[in-house]
Regions:
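PAPS-dependent sulfotransferase catalytic domain
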Residues: 1-80
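PAPS-dependent sulfotransferase catalytic core
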Residues: 25-26, 58-114
């Protein structure tokens, strides 16, 4: 699966598989001034709600729980990345995202969920 994703051009790739940097950046500049992270989604959602309140904008309500497929336990993630070739493919395909959103972390820290 990952080999196909990695070898498919952005133009032909489903939007759900595109690197986020292709969607959120223009000329390598991040356009939104707030981007939540999956790892801190509850906290980020609260921060977004507070910002909307301060600006007098409508609240979004509770964070929707759509497409939830697993619990918050991600201890099995390192098992998926034991193969250095797989790590290479991911970092090549999604390297801009890793740099943009996790530039202060090493690949190993990301794999371990740190």
């Amino acid at each position: 699966f990952l080999d196909v994703v990695a070898s498919t051009s952005d133009d032909s790739l489903d939007i759900h598989l595109l690197p986020q940097s292709k969607i959120l950046c223009h000329e390598r500049q991040l356009i939104p001034n707030f981007v939540g992270h999956l790892e801190t989604m509850d906290q980020d959602w609260r921060s977004l709600q507070q910002h909307l309140r301060r600006e007098g904008l409508p609240e979004l309500g509770a964070l929707p729980e759509k497409n939830v497929r697993r619990v918050s336990d991600h201890r099995d993630v390192p098992d998926y990345f034991k193969d250095p070739g797989l790590v290479r493919i991911v970092t090549e395909r999604y390297g801009d995202d890793i740099e943009l959103f996790y530039g202060n972390k090493t690949t190993e820290q990301l794999i371990q969920g740190e």
